[in-house]
Amino acid sequence: MLLPRRCPRGDSSAMCVLAFAWQAHPRWPLVVAGNRDELHDRPTAPLARWEEADHLIAGRDLQSGGTWLGVSERGRFAVVTNLRGFGAPEPQRVSRGALVTTLLADEQPLAAIDESEFGRFNPFNLIVADREAAWFLSNGSGPV
């Protein structure tokens, strides 16, 4: 699956892209490739185990404290992409990076995700997967 998204600066030559293969090969249950081509001047930390949440391995958005992509020790993977075209982002909303950190810390089954909370975030696409299931979630409207 490939999820291209225009970056906020409106440059059509730059896209945020994610490609992943889930349960496509017995040796590698999940393969992920992507780029975070959102705001090059936004401070980030590279992929690492988080000290305060040592079950989490992810990059870190140093501005909001969340992450755009990560994996937990239990094998849960999550990635969020911004969804553009619904007006300017509202800065008072909860950071979309909190979705990923919350879902990676959660031990409930993926089927129990509470989508009623999604309205607190600016528009997003979210992919969450573990060994048993993979989910695509979004709070945007229209085709993906």
Where are these regions (language model features)?
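N-terminal nucleophile
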Residues: 2-3, 10-144
